[in-house]
Amino acid sequence: MTRPAFATRRRTQLFDAVVALFLAEGFAHLTLDEIAARLRCSKSTLYTLAASKEQLVQAATVHFFRAATDAVEARVDAVAGARERIVEYLAAVGAALDPASDQFMADLDAFAPAREIYERNTRIAAGRVQELIAEGVAAGDFRDVHAAFAADLVAA
């Protein structure tokens, strides 16, 4: 394995571990020293991911949503039929968010940069539901409806 491939894999593993820790316990109460100790790595290793705790939280939040999006879309791609795809999409989104503890969600809401990432991804998810509805209309599976309105109803 080449050095860049190893570095990329190791970086992904570290982000996965940071995300798992944050999802389980939140992040506001953790210091970089505590994060490093919990992950059994050095603080300098964490600094290869981000220059500060705040930037680490932001980067981990982005990493989480990228991985969640990939997992959700893989599940949707495996299903045929407009209704089934929408149901699978919503179930997959729920499954992706299931590991998020109440503390993580509270910390996310309290930290504006991470909250903005969450809100942006929520808007993207609502747009994806609109796309799935529009695909169903185009395929004749649904009546022609205002997709944005229908997506808002589904998301509520």
Predicted regions and their residues:
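Basic, helix-initiating cap at the start of DNA-binding domains
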Residues: 1-25, 29-38, 54-58
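Helix-turn-helix/winged-helix DNA-binding modules
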Residues: 24-27, 48, 142
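Short hydrophobic/aromatic patch on the recognition helix
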Residues: 39-50
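Alpha-helical DNA-contacting segments of helix-turn-helix folds
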Residues: 50, 55-64
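Hydrophobic alpha-helical connector segments
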Residues: 59, 70-99, 151-154
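Hydrophobic alpha-helical bundle segments that form small-molecule/ligand-binding pockets
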Residues: 77-80, 122-154
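Short secondary-structure transition hinges
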Residues: 91-131
